[in-house]
Regions:
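Glycine/charged-rich beta-loop-alpha catalytic/anionic-binding loops adjacent to active sites
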Residues: 10-13, 85-89
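Second-shell loop/turn segments in exported
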Residues: 19, 89-94
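Residue-level preference for long, well-ordered alpha-helices that form the structural scaffold
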Residues: 21, 25, 96, 141-148
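Aromatic/hydrophobic pocket-lining residues that form the small-molecule binding cavity
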Residues: 29, 100, 152
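Short beta-strand-loop
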Residues: 43-87, 132-136, 176-187, 207-208
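Structured catalytic core of nucleotide-sugar glycosyltransferases
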Residues: 97-103
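Von Willebrand factor type A / integrin I
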Residues: 104-120, 128-131, 135-220
Length: 220
């Protein structure tokens, strides 16, 4: 039985190219996995990659992850794709949006069977989501839209109901605004989680520190 179950949600949307943020994100993933393998081998750890969709990733896949290429440069994007339509595949969809809602949904599925009260999501991102699912429909909305924010907050509430805490590590980026920061606080605090501001270069240190703190609280 794991004492602690964690899903790490890694933002690999187009903006993570900025200042090589994606490199720091991958380094953090490897550092956290190494710590758990050495010190807490019974703990559960799963990685989920987020772009316009969310995909589970094995630790062996993390080093090869890359930010998705930006394929649309329009100042306003409002797209809807019916992913239940067999004529529509993932390859038809611009990949560089940020679907945190789908990432949290996958995280809940991984954490549901874990027999521990200590469940959490570590979300590493640089700002507001720009994609979400409503049933089979995928919405890609830029600039960030209230509809996507509300869908993501609903997913956060489901996490909270299932005893899952969301901690957010918010990376600085050129486009970050007060709205990005406020959203991170709303999402984290709705699950009794926290927001950490860290430069990318320090990310691995802070995430490992947070994990060790959490383990000490459990033991205490």
């Amino acid at each position: 039985t794991p004492k602690c179950a964690t899903v790490v949600v890694l933002d690999m949307s187009g903006s993570m190219r900025y200042d090589g943020l994606y490199i720091d994100v991958k380094r953090m993933g490897l550092a956290l996995e190494g710590l758990i393998r050495r010190e807490y081998p019974g703990d559960f750890l799963q990685f989920v990659e987020v772009y316009s969709f969310a995909k589970p990733r094995h630790i062996s896949e993390v080093p090869a992850l890359m930010p998705r290429p930006v394929t649309l440069y329009d100042p306003v994007v409002q797209l809807r794709a019916d992913m239940s339509d067999e004529k529509v595949s993932e390859f038809d969809v611009p990949p560089h949006f940020t679907n945190i809602q789908h990432g949290l949904q996958l995280a809940r599925r991984f954490l549901a069977p874990q027999d521990t009260p200590n469940k959490r999501v570590v979300l590493i991102t640089d700002g507001l989501p720009t994609a979400h699912f409503e049933e089979q429909f995928l919405y890609l909305l830029y600039p960030p839209h209230r509809r996507t924010e509300e869908a993501t907050m609903r997913e956060g509430q489901l996490c909270h109901r299932e005893g899952i805490t969301i901690n957010i590590f918010l990376l600085p980026s050129w486009s970050q605004s007060r709205e990005d920061v406020q959203f991170a606080y709303r999402l984290a605090e709705s699950t009794a989680g926290k927001v950490f501001f860290t430069a990318g270069k320090d990310l691995d240190r802070y995430v490992v520190w947070d994990y060790l703190n959490r383990r000490r609280e459990i033991v205490a």
